[in-house]
Amino acid sequence: MRLNLSGHLSDHITFCYTGGQRLERDRPTALFIHGAGHDHSVWMLQTRYFAHHGWNVIAPDLPGHGRSSGPALKSIEDLAHWIITLAHKLGTERPVVIGHSMGALIALQVAATAPELVSQLALVGVVAPMPVAPALLDATLSNRDKAHALINQWSFAPHSQIGASGVPGINLTALNERLMERQAPGVLHTDMAACNAYRAGFDAAAQVRCPTLLLSSAQDRMTPPKALAPLATAFNTDFQPTRVVLPDAGHAMMSESPGQVLDALWAFISSQPTGQAPA
């Protein structure tokens, strides 16, 4: 699905993946937000499952990413306002908002800025603040190949880096490298700089007014579970998040452990009174 968010920060064509299904007003909606240097395809298994089990799915390519035109937006706050505009444009009512990495920061800021919009929140592979190593941030400007290699080194568990994959015949690190290569020059740096500069995470968490899942992975070296504690404690006492840690994946958990990620999201959403899990 393509649409134009006319008059907003990005007056360009936006591509949204819907899992191969039409949006229906009588269905609950899940809005998936990808991370830095990626596009909607990182959510392929999860979005298709939701779309074929009674849910509307909206998985946009952020501005300047994938099939969406325009420049990449430079701050998490601008990206959050863009997501809010997209949700209103599509007429979605209180979607579940799910984000990974940079997308999780965006989702968090969306829930803080427009708490009336979000029914449930799932933050996958997140910490706040989310500092980016200077060597990686420099490489995103000066040497894209090096940046991609560093990201693969830090994003995947050791067994994935030597060829293990839940999908036979798929090289996960090569697939991730090709995905990053498809983004326009400068997009990865803009994304990483936005993550590095975002300092509003604790304030945002305190403003969240919906059930929240913090989904981590034990072998994640970019957003390790132990670094999540400060953000987890920043949530309002009436809205303490549910924490789940997957045992066998790294930061790229949607591709390393796609079924486990889906199971964790589905179980959390189904357990909440606002979730409309199908029979």
Regions found by a protein language model. Give the residues of each.
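Short beta-strand/loop motif that positions the catalytic acidic residue
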Residues: 208, 214-216, 220
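Conserved alpha/beta-hydrolase catalytic His-Asp/Glu region
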Residues: 138-209
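Active-site glycine-rich loops that stabilize anionic/oxyanionic intermediates
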Residues: 35-38, 101
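Catalytic histidine neighborhood in serine/cysteine hydrolases
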Residues: 233-251
